[in-house]
């Protein structure tokens, strides 16, 4: 149902196809959360049913149209589709993204299609995955080629079930702050001093959330080992 012409927050880059898959997944989970609030708090059962009905309709469409059988990674979620068999295979660092779907509660982290998608987006098969001397991660057309968004590295850590992978992500984030002590919007894959937005509250807040999550999960030793 999400057919707006632009992509993520602040991104005026127009879509190539009509339906942005991660945003539609997010719509499904958001509609169900709204229905719960409407039912339990507002006692608006009729409106709540409209939300759950729409969520079910969009979910059915995603199951039918949002996947693609990739020759290397198996069945994955496409980034954009048009419902006529065309798929755009990529991911963008902006959240909602394919990588971030379990973080947002849109899919289970153990969903096999998600795990295939996760491997795809963190590879050279994703045209907006960049790897260089300073670090690696996903960027997007909002900033341009070779610029890694720390947000993507955070989302990899948020959705990881491997402590060593999480440790690598956090170290990379710490090593690419250009000595400023802050997360930036993006940094050049070969030179972290070439960055955009010296102060980007969204990224800084997410980094704090990631550290707090690890502390709450009893992984202080992991953090202390960095």
What residue ranges belong to the model's regions?
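Single conserved hydrophobic/aromatic residue that forms the stacking wall/gate
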Residues: 2-9, 13
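Conserved small-residue packing positions in alpha-helical repeats and bundles
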Residues: 35, 99-102, 154-155, 208
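C-terminal amphipathic alpha-helical segment
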Residues: 86-111
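A short, mixed-charge helix-start or loop-turn motif at secondary-structure junctions
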Residues: 14-17, 193
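Aromatic- and histidine-enriched alpha-helix N-cap/loop-to-helix transition segments
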Residues: 18-29, 92-96, 145-152, 198-209
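Inter-helical turn/loop segments and adjacent helix faces that build the functional surface
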Residues: 33-52
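Non-catalytic carbohydrate-binding regions of carbohydrate-active enzymes
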Residues: 46-84, 105-206, 213-226
